[in-house]
Amino acid sequence: MTQPAIYLDNNATTRVFPEVVAAMLPYFTEHFGNASSGHGFGAQAGLGLRKARLAVAALIGAASEQEILFTSGGTEANTTAIRSALAVQDGRREIIISAVEHPAILMLAADLEKTEGVRVHRIPVDHLGRLDLAAYRAALSDRVAVASIMWANNRYDLPVPQLAAEAHAAGALFHTDAVQAVGKLPMSLADTEIDMLSLSGHKFHGPKGVGALYLRKGVAFRPLLRGGKQERGRRAGTENVPALVGMGLAAEIVAARMAADLSRIATLRDWLESGILALGGCQRLGDPANRLANTCTLAFDRIDSEAVLTKLARAGIAISTGSACASGAMEPSHVTRAMAVPFTAAHGVVRFSLSADTTAAELSRVLAILPEILAELRPVPVTA
């Protein structure tokens, strides 16, 4: 009898909660109006959007739902934040990013550097993924428009509120790509100096194709998309009401369950990680004291991570070779290189990312199957 598949790639995307799917359906067939319309159908859609905005604001601890600007996802939110900061910070033509940002930030920065003459400071990290704080502070000046530092990577999380305060001391705005962090870390943005934050619904059991940019009240802003007056004139384009309603409900559910879920998930993660490390020939990546509760990233020595992924997939187990946004490349990811993972292990990086759906029985099956796979893939020692 075929066993059910096991999904351990929740940092790439998550299963949409059934309640979320059910909540979205009426907005396709009954409350299908344009939220900008002045009749009853538009009003119903507008109510759905307001409820979603309130839920997202509550999840991240924003001071007001008016600080939430809906977008098509994290990439749009990131691009909007950085381009806006450069536009409103007159005369400041430098930005600060980390060496381990998402490609959406890295490629935008490279484009700004090449085509618009923006100077980009790329701050390195150490072998645990911790930001070089001295280099960050040295890069801050009255020429910097914005510092954009990811809140959590697939392997670690950073002291973002502290970094925001230091950016403000230099007169710079602060943005954080929190796509991997929202729903996995408790947040209270109202108590921080963070100016802008990006999030994406599909990372916390909402639908794909929707996200948001948190924009702190009073922060100067220049829209990226112009045209209609949607999102209080800050983002043109008819809102995807069904998906945004779904993201809002996902935010409600995750916020209500976060403390209990994260505790249970971290316990399962630690058990899985201990079991794999006990097999030998691998090392844990990231700062064990500051990382996402659901994530276990390991580097296997002298083993190709793509081969591990393929063999586990054949057994019905889904994992990732680090980051799904970079998988398929035949070279170590930029994060692996930035963390100076030893050459013999750099091609063996795999990521197990759990969710509230993950069970101990599923992880037991992984631990039962993995030793045989590693034995097949590990080179046979040469004897004299």
Curated annotation (Swiss-Prot):
Concerning Gene3D superfamilies, the annotation shows:
1.10.260.50, Aspartate Aminotransferase, domain 1, Type I PLP-dependent aspartate aminotransferase-like (Major domain)
List the signal peptide residues. none
Q: Which chemical reaction does it catalyze? A: (sulfur carrier)-H + L-cysteine = (sulfur carrier)-SH + L-alanine
Please give the biological process terms from Gene Ontology that the record holds: nitrogen fixation
Keyword Transferase included in the entry's annotation: yes
Subunit notes for this chain? Homodimer.
Name under which the protein is recorded? Cysteine desulfurase
Organism equals: Rhodobacter capsulatus (Rhodopseudomonas capsulata)
Instruction: Show the taxonomic lineage.
Output: Bacteria, Pseudomonadati, Pseudomonadota, Alphaproteobacteria, Rhodobacterales
